[in-house]
């Protein structure tokens, strides 16, 4: 079950840069191989999915993903897991897939993961479709040269045809919804060091370079982006180069980064883009992301989770690099990028309740329900932020969790514009 759940991490479809324009690193499945389980103890559906081999395992994984902007994507993904010849840890993972979406057609994708040591990973992904394509490579080493220094490198060429834009401001109308295609080539390099040995405080310095091109999207039934927003389209003509330097300081006492049940996380950043660095735009941005997780019992059956996020951009930046509100990792009653402006403030709180624990194939899976509330808005600057444009949301998530790394989640959010449904992996925060 751990391998089946871990495979869900691989199943993410092509996606654009995150709500925070400087991209996060891709999730990489754990290299831990679960202990073998007697065949009679493995449920029948897992015996169909799992096929043990001499040095590894084959998996046949169905894929389903829902998103307000992309609709339903489904398909299959066979996975070949290769163990070390002299041990029981995973050394390589090959994960090709074939998915289908009614708007974007079939998408063949190939994923490859390599683990040179326990705290390092190499990830490669390539995909091609009618309107989209991607080539991505990432290397992450949390103990560079056997020290507490972390090093990360990301290079990506991506074309995402699902992007939406409604205009700038907290009162942008659904009637102005357009679809655009974002094509970009980017690289990200990051180095992190602890303040003191084994400290909860770390500093990260990141260098991000991207070349973006914006064009009309392919989705039918929507006004062309260049027609609805001619000024933004004209400003986005050609490929625009942005070069950003970012300094981040974070504090982290969470028990697990992905399946958190207790602890606190605080991240503060400041970044700037300047023509002296080769960028075509000059701007700066600062922000804060705070999260707290409070367990109400020793078994962590009841956990209250809360998040507050703030960002503010100063100077000139193209619209696709402004703060965007909406989506599973922002405000769960709207699609990605529903609201766009120079600043954003979002708060979320949810009560996680584990209602059932099941042990299958030597792995304990927890099933939880998590009603949530959220409130958020975008603004040009905080001094003119207006309460009437604060967007409240409520809803609930149902999840299957295999700690410490795997979460399968169905999130249903209700807001002022109706219901949004997200089904994929990971917590919202």
PLM feature spans:
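Bacterial N-terminal signal peptides
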Residues: 1-10
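N-terminal periplasmic/intermembrane-space "pro-region" immediately following the signal or transit peptide
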Residues: 12-61, 65-68
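Outer-membrane beta-barrel proteins
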Residues: 44-51, 79-86, 114-118, 140-145, ...
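Gram-negative/organellar outer-membrane beta-barrel architecture
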Residues: 50-59, 65-241, 407, 415-429
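Hydrophobic, lipid-facing positions within transmembrane beta-strands of outer-membrane proteins
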Residues: 58-60, 74-76, 106-110, 133-137, ...
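Membrane-embedded beta-strand positions of outer-membrane beta-barrel proteins
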Residues: 60-62, 94-98, 124-126, 151-155, ...
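C-terminal outer-membrane beta-barrel translocator/porin domains of Gram-negative envelope proteins
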Residues: 227-238, 242-367, 379
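C-terminal beta-signal and terminal closure region of outer-membrane beta-barrel proteins
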Residues: 383-429
């Amino acid at each position: 079950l751990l391998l089946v759940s871990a495979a869900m991490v691989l199943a993410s479809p092509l996606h654009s840069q995150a709500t925070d324009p400087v991209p996060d690193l891709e999730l990489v499945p754990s290299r831990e191989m679960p202990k073998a389980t007697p065949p009679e103890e493995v449920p029948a559906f897992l015996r169909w999915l799992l096929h043990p081999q001499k040095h590894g395992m084959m998996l046949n994984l169905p894929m389903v993903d829902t998103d307000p902007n992309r609709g339903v994507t489904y398909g299959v993904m066979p996975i070949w897991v290769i163990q070390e010849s002299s041990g029981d840890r995973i050394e390589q993972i090959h994960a090709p897939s074939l998915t289908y979406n009614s708007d974007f057609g079939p998408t063949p994708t190939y994923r490859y993961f390599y683990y040179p040591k326990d705290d390092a990973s190499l990830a490669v992904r390539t995909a091609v479709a009618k309107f989209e394509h991607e080539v991505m490579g990432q290397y992450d080493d949390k103990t560079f040269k056997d020290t507490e220094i972390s090093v990360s490198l990301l290079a990506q060429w991506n074309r995402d045809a699902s992007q939406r834009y409604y205009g700038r401001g907290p009162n942008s109308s659904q009637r102005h919804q357009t679809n655009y295609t974002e094509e970009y080539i980017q690289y990200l390099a990051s180095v992190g060091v602890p303040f003191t040995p084994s400290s909860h405080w770390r500093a990260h310095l990141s260098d991000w370079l991207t070349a973006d091109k914006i064009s009309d999207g392919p989705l039918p039934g929507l006004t062309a982006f260049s027609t609805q927003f001619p000024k933004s389209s004209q400003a986005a003509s050609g490929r625009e180069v942005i070069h950003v330097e970012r300094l981040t300081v974070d504090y982290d006492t969470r028990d697990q980064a992905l399946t958190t049940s207790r602890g606190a996380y605080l991240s503060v950043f400041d970044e700037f883009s300047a023509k002296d660095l080769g960028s075509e735009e000059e701007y700066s941005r600062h922000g804060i992301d705070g999260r707290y997780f409070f367990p109400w019992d020793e078994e962590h059956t009841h956990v209250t989770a809360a998040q507050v996020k703030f960002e503010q951009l100063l100077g000139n930046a193209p619209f696709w690099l402004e703060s965007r509100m909406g989506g599973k990792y922002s405000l769960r009653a709207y699609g990605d990028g529903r609201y766009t402006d120079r600043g954003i403030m979002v708060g979320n709180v949810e009560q996680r309740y584990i209602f059932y624990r099941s042990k299958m194939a030597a792995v304990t899976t927890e099933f939880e329900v998590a009603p949530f509330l959220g409130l958020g808005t975008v603004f040009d600057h905080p001094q003119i932020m207006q309460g009437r444009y604060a967007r409240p949301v409520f809803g609930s998530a149902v999840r299957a969790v295999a700690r410490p790394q795997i979460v399968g989640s169905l999130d249903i959010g209700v807001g002022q514009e109706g219901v949004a449904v997200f089904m994929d992996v990971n917590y919202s925060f």
